Amino acid sequence: MLTKKQSELLRFINERMKETGVPPSFDEMKDALDLRSKSGIHRLIIALEERGFIRRLPNRARALEVLRMPGASAADAGRGRKFEPSVIEGHLGRVRPMPAARDDEDGARAMVAIPVMGRIAAGTPISALQTRSHTLNLPPEMLSQGEHYALEVRGDSMIDAGIFDADTVLIRKQDTAETGDIVVALIDDEEATLKRLRRRGASIALEAANPAYETRIFGPDRVRIQGKLVGLIRRY
């Protein structure tokens, strides 16, 4: 049986992951539960983990997985599980099993070739997007409407959003985005970077998901949106 605070935290984590695909930060959890310190959140997370409601994913910053909610047994949660490659998808990265590719009439897997357009900085911006280096064959279930491309991540500025160095991000081509979206931003037509977009009055803020990096503020004429994050592929 969970305490009131344990139940509140579990619901908050579960709802946030359904909305954004990313677990809330300790500060967000602390504020949501009206606690004075993050140590209280740490104790609640340990208690939920010991009771089998969540698990912390090793060697990843801010990585939690909800295993079950109250009323669902651990056996129910684990029944029928099998190993499948993990794919993080959604506009802010939602962890889901990679969907199985559909077969065509000849029994071959119907895949979509997505161009990999070089590397993108999740850190200090690097030179503008490079030309196509190779392609990835992905099942159509992974793709939303529109044209897509992929980029290889270099840097650690987005680790709190679950995006790590050497990950491959799937980007939908578009030149607009909502505040809070993770986007490929082209700065002064020279530097490309992967950051969270925030609008601050007439200015645009490119926000890292790592406290070691400062938010950068630009005039609207200096930043062009090159696409929005819709998926992430990680190789183990």
Swiss-Prot record:
GO biological process: DNA repair; DNA replication; negative regulation of DNA-templated transcription; proteolysis; SOS response
Keyword Repressor annotated: yes
Gene3D superfamilies: Umud Fragment, subunit A, Winged helix-like DNA-binding domain superfamily/Winged helix DNA-binding domain
Reactions that this protein is recorded to catalyse: Hydrolysis of Ala-|-Gly bond in repressor LexA
Site description Cleavage, residues in chain: 122-123
Pfam families documented for this protein: LexA_DNA_bind, Peptidase_S24
Family annotation (InterPro entries): LexA, LexA-like, LexA/Signal_pep-like_sf, LexA_DNA-bd_dom, LexA_repressor, Peptidase_S24_LexA, Peptidase_S24_S26A/B/C, WH-like_DNA-bd_sf
Active site per the UniProt annotation: 157 (for autocatalytic cleavage activity), 195 (for autocatalytic cleavage activity)
Enzyme Commission number(s) of this protein: 3.4.21.88
Superkingdom of this protein's organism: Bacteria
Keywords: Autocatalytic cleavage, DNA damage, DNA repair, DNA replication, DNA-binding, Hydrolase, Repressor, SOS response, Transcription, Transcription regulation
DNA-binding region range list: 26-46
Family of the protein in this entry: Belongs to the peptidase S24 family.
Matches recorded under NCBIfam families: lexA
Cross-referenced HAMAP family: LexA
Function: Represses a number of genes involved in the response to DNA damage (SOS response), including recA and lexA. In the presence of single-stranded DNA, RecA interacts with LexA causing an autocatalytic cleavage which disrupts the DNA-binding part of LexA, leading to derepression of the SOS regulon and eventually DNA repair.
PANTHER family assigned to the protein according to its UniProt record, in alphabetical order: LEXA REPRESSOR (PTHR33516), LEXA REPRESSOR-RELATED (PTHR33516:SF2)
Subunit structure: Homodimer.
Official protein name in the record: LexA repressor
Organism in which the protein naturally occurs: Methylocella silvestris (strain DSM 15510 / CIP 108128 / LMG 27833 / NCIMB 13906 / BL2)
